[in-house]
Design a protein with these regions (language model features):
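N-terminal leader/linker segments that initiate helical-solenoid repeat arrays
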Residues: 15, 24-114, 328, 344-427
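Generic helix N-cap/helix-start motif at coil->alpha-helix transitions
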Residues: 40-43, 75-84, 108-118, 145-153, ...
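Alpha-solenoid helical-repeat scaffolds
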Residues: 51-56, 69-179
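Alpha-helical repeat scaffolds
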Residues: 62-70, 97-107, 129-142, 165-177, ...
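Structural motif corresponding to the intra-repeat A-B loop/turn of tetratricopeptide repeats
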Residues: 94-95, 125-128, 161-163, 199, ...
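Residue-level signature for tetratricopeptide repeat
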Residues: 122-123, 157-159, 191-196, 215, ...
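Solenoidal tandem-repeat scaffolds enriched in leucines and small polar residues
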Residues: 168-238
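Long, repeat-rich segments with strong aromatic
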Residues: 250-315, 322
């Protein structure tokens, strides 16, 4: 990691010097670099971050501050060069200070800045982008083959998404195709996956996912992509088959593939998709090896939970009981407790009393089961906790997904008892 920091800093320094090797010069001899040259350093650093060098974040902040100072200090004649105008606009769309763009536009007496673009960006950066969505869309088409084109297209996609998500995909496609291998493509692909998943565009979602996994799996934003991909797989299985999943995760290293399969197994388990849960947990266990480390233990947990509604319930109960509690996170301990409670009801002989009562399944919930980290790399974007019904003696809070799992199991048990009663098995 230190080597990556040095490499990013060194290459950025070379770019700051206009591509010339660094040499000792006095402050008086240091030339003032044009904004467009400085912007190249920022773009390089940001692209390095997107490709997996998380250590370049500090250099990115340094470059933003450096460019901000240079733009404010620049003579108005500097912007007679269209490349410097583009640099100022791209800087503003790359996390720069919006007030600096405002300052430059106010001083522009020569009409170097396209007032339409400047006004639209000021509204966008001021949180009013939806008011200029159509204008930005038109400008994305107009500037698509120019330096600012991919940036304007990305912004257009962002402001179009709330009202017309599928329409935003067109702008994201323009952005990523105009800036391949950059942070622009990373952002456009990631947001395209999210839109495709929410809109049930399975084929597009899978295609975008494979492109992202191939290029940006080491991005600091990749965990968001994994969230979307897991949702896509679980919601559309078996339409999305095992080969479809494998063709996407094959671009990932072993550790990330294992993480993805664990997250698929967990969500599939809680959603009652037991075939998918067993498949994913089996793949995660195979990737983890035979050592009883965290990932292998989690794979056993999810495989056991997924086996409860099957004829292998007895084996599942034994497997769940054999998992050491200290190797599970508090949330996964709560999941195991819920699964064991449901499993015990599955194998319990129904009685007349059980048909008459309406008591809830007793789950020993843990007060610390609201910890966010449920498994390696797992991120739950929803509410962390939800209250148990008042009928439970221990009125604490547990994971809402586990609450749903318990209620689903309780409902299935009730249906089974009703069928037995109708058939006269229970009197």
């Amino acid at each position: 990691m230190p080597r990556m920091v040095f490499r990013s800093a060194a290459l950025a320094a070379v770019l700051l010097l206009g591509g010339q090797p660094a040499r000792s010069v006095s402050a008086q001899e240091t030339p003032e670099l044009a904004p467009y040259i400085m912007l190249r350093s920022l773009q390089f650093v940001q692209d390095t971050v997107a490709l997996g060098d998380h250590s370049a974040g500090e250099m990115q902040r340094f470059m933003l501050n450096k460019i901000d100072s240079a733009l404010r200090a620049a003579d108005t004649s500097t912007f007679d060069d269209p490349r410097n105008v583009d640099a100022a606009l791209i800087y503003a769309m790359s996390g720069g200070n919006p007030a600096t763009l405002e300052y430059l536009v106010e001083r522009d007496l020569s009409g170097n800045f396209d007032s339409r673009v400047a006004d639209a960006l000021r509204k966008y950066l001021g949180g009013k982008g939806t008011l200029v969505a159509k204008s930005l869309g038109d400008m994305a088409m107009e500037y698509r083959d120019q330096a600012i084109g991919p940036y304007v297209a990305l912004v257009s996609g962002n402001v179009t998404d709330p009202e017309n998500p599928v329409g935003a995909l067109e702008y994201y496609d323009i952005a990523r195709l105009g800036a391949p291998g950059t942070i622009i493509e990373e952002a456009a692909l990631r947001r395209s996956v999210a839109i495709a998943v929410d809109a049930d565009l399975v084929d597009k979602g899978l295609a975008y996912s494979r492109k992202y996994a191939r290029r940006f799996v080491h991005s600091p934003y990749a965990s968001q992509f994994v969230d979307f991909f897991v949702q896509l797989v679980v919601e559309h299985h078996p339409e999305l088959s095992e080969p479809d999943i494998d063709a996407t995760v094959e671009f990932m290293d072993v550790e990330r593939r294992r993480e993805v399969f664990l997250r698929i197994a967990r969500r599939a388990t809680l959603d009652g998709k037991n075939d998918l849960a067993r498949m994913a947990s089996g793949k995660a266990a195979a990737l983890a090896g035979m050592a009883a480390d965290g990932p292998e233990v989690l794979a056993r947990l999810y495989r056991g939970v997924a086996s409860i509604p099957t004829s292998e319930v007895g084996t599942a109960i034994e497997d769940l009981a054999a998992i050491p509690a200290d190797e599970l996170s508090p949330r996964d301990q709560a999941l195991r407790a819920a699964a064991q409670a449901i499993a015990s009801e599955v194998i319990r002989k129904p009685t007349t009393e059980s048909l008459a009562q309406d008591a809830g399944v007793k789950v020993e919930a843990r007060p610390d089961a609201e910890i966010e980290e449920a498994s390696p790399g797992y991120e739950d974007p929803g509410p962390a906790v939800v209250a148990l019904p008042a009928s439970l003696e221990s009125s604490v809070e547990i994971d809402p997904e586990i609450q749903t799992f318990v209620e689903s199991g309780r409902s299935k048990l009730s249906e089974i008892d009703d069928l037995l009663k109708q058939e006269g098995v229970v009197r």
